[in-house]
C-alpha cells in the first residue's frame, strides 16, 4: 500500500518536500532573493499557517501530512469560502491570504515540475470581488463653509485657506498638495495652470480659475516674497527658523480641524 510520501507518485504528494519547500520559500527566497520586508514575510507565514489550519480543521488533513496536492483548485475554492463565511473576513483579507498560497505554489513549481499542474490550476481560482465604496460629495453649501472655515488673523490660517482653495479648484489629493513647488505654478500662461505630480510619478497639467490665480498671487507675495525660490515647497511651515514642506498628516489634521469646525 502506497503512502502520501511515496516518491512514485511525485513530489506533489511528498509531505517532506512540501515542508522543506515552504521553509526555503519563507527563510531564503522571500528575504534574500525577493528582498521582502520582515512584515511581508510574517504576513505570508501567517497566511500559510491559516491555510494549513483550514486543511486540518475542514479537510481532516493532519499538519505533518500536508502536501502540495492538498492545495488543489477545489480545496483553494473551499478555503476562500471558509475565510469569507466562517471567519467572516473582508474580501481584501481573503484575497491577501490566497495570494500567499499562490506565491508558494509559483515558487514550488519553479523548483519542481511536478508542482506545475497544481500551480496552474490554482491560477483559475479568482479572488473575491471587493465592493467599491460609494464616493460622497460635498454639497455646495458645505464646500463653501469649509473654504471659509480658516480665519484671516493668523498666518497659518491664511496658508491653510489657500491650500483648501487650490485643492478644491484643482481636485488634488493630499499627497499632491504636499508635493507642490513654486515652479509648479504657471500663473502667466494664456490659460493659467498648475503642474501636479500624481500617482506613478506622472505629471498632469490642471487649469485653474481666475479667482484662484488672484489668491495665489497674494499668497506668493506674503509667503515667498518678490523673488520666490522656484524649488521651494509651495506650502510650508517654519520650525526653529527653518522652512520645511508640510506632511500628509499635517494636511489631514488641517482638514479634520475645519470639518469639525463646520459641524458646530
What are these regions (language model features)?
Residues 1-264:
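Conserved catalytic core of the tyrosine transesterase superfamily
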